[in-house]
Amino acid sequence: MKKACFVLVLIVMLGMLCGCGEYVKSYAATILITSGHGDEASMKFDTFTGSYNFKLKRDGNPEHTLDLDASLRKGEMNVYIGVGGEKELLLTVKGGESYDETITLAKEYDNEKTIYIILESVGKCVDGDFEFEYN
């Protein structure tokens, strides 16, 4: 009986470990503020190194767009869109640049109700502000 309970606990733990999201967060940051609710997400930081992702779900009629506001004082940040474990580069934000634009997504994302936005730094980034809305 003890062995059966032990095996059951191991199976449940294995299932929990394997049930993680498709993308992994791995980062070091100071003064990191993130928010992700439904079709909107944001991230602000003083310093950031690594990778962070947001899961966005589209509500209502699809417009096939992603609204993006981004700024970075120093460093370089790659912004990807992810679906099904794959990712595609949307744009690269470099130190001193800022963006306020609406990106029309490729047709392959037309039927996707859920996407991931993945932010990956190239080295250390300083004073970043990123906001997204999936339409």
Predicted regions and their residues:
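Transition segment at domain starts
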Residues: 21-57
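Edge beta-strands of jelly-roll/beta-sandwich modules across compartments, strongly enriched
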Residues: 121-135
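Extended extracellular/luminal ectodomain segments enriched in beta-structured repeat modules
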Residues: 59-66, 110-112
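C-terminal motif of bacterial Sec signal peptides marking the signal peptidase cleavage site
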Residues: 15-19
